[in-house]
């Protein structure tokens, strides 16, 4: 089958303009641009690696053909990540069960546990354990692990973790072959390279500062829910993405 080549509008051929448009314009108009309604989700607390509780939502259509398991990027939560909710609508409309979750230190998961992100040590296993729990709820294989930006990297870690499932997850009612694969957009494959580029570029520095502000909000949210987990002084000192990692993970 021959597929047409996608050609964006002239003003959106620039990657930065496309990013700004997505953040500033599409985020406000996306619901008017899709014919698919929001699935009826049920809330679920999954148990990830190391026993960490992870908040998620699940929707299962009649006769599902597979399951989409997804999360978002470096900041946000399930309530404001419209890009992920749009994916959920489209997937459900095409007959897929949908599992979306707040990953470690984000959203309602941060309210359940003060556990911080692990830079890939456990996020991949989280994905697989969530898929196994979703299977027990009636979500069928194959399971497709999805995400965008940093969430895409987490999904790829999930695919990697699934390849060694027999060595660490023998108690799970899930077989490696039931993980169909991953589908990611702009995964953050080399964080050092990405951050170095950001802080060297004038526009990039503004974007990095905006992300750092959101990370600081996230850290304060964890502190308010779990006062003993993060020192207020450490949060105050964390004014960059690298600073966030240095101050919070050294605490």
Whereabouts are the PLM-identified features?
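N-terminal cap/lid segment of alpha/beta-hydrolase-fold proteins
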Residues: 22-63
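N-terminal presequences and immediately downstream first alpha-helices
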Residues: 1-32
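Short helix/loop capping segments that flank catalytic or ligand/cofactor-binding pockets
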Residues: 54-55, 79, 192-194
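Catalytic nucleophile-loop/oxyanion-hole region of alpha/beta-hydrolase
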Residues: 80-81, 90, 106-144
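Hydrophobic/aromatic beta-strand patches that form the interior of the parallel beta-sheet core
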Residues: 44, 69, 99, 144-146, ...
């Amino acid at each position: 089958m021959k597929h047409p080549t996608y050609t964006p509008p002239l003003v959106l051929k620039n990657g930065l303009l496309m990013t700004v448009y997505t953040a500033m314009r599409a985020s406000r108009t996306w619901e008017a641009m899709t014919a698919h309604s929001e699935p009826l989700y049920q809330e679920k607390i999954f148990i990830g690696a190391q026993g960490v509780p992870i908040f998620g939502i699940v929707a299962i259509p009649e006769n599902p053909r597979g399951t989409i398991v997804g999360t978002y990027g470096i900041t946000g939560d399930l309530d404001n990540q419209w890009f992920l909710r749009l994916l959920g609508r489209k997937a459900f409309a095409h007959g897929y069960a949908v599992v979306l979750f707040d990953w470690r230190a984000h959203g309602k998961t941060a309210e359940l546990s003060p556990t911080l992100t692990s830079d890939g040590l456990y996020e991949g296993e989280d994905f697989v354990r969530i898929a196994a729990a979703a299977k027990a709820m009636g979500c069928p294989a194959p399971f497709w692990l999805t995400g965008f930006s940093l969430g895409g990297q987490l999904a790829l870690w999930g695919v990697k973790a699934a390849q060694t499932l027999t060595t660490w997850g023998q108690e799970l009612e899930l077989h490696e072959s039931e993980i169909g694969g991953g589908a990611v957009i702009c995964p953050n494959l080399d964080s050092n390279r990405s951050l170095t580029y950001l802080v060297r570029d004038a526009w990039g520095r503004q974007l990095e500062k905006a992300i750092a502000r959101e990370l600081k909000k996230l850290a304060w949210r964890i502190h308010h829910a779990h006062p003993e987990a993060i020192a207020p002084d450490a949060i105050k000192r964390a004014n960059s993405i690298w600073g966030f990692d240095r101050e919070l993970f050294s605490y």
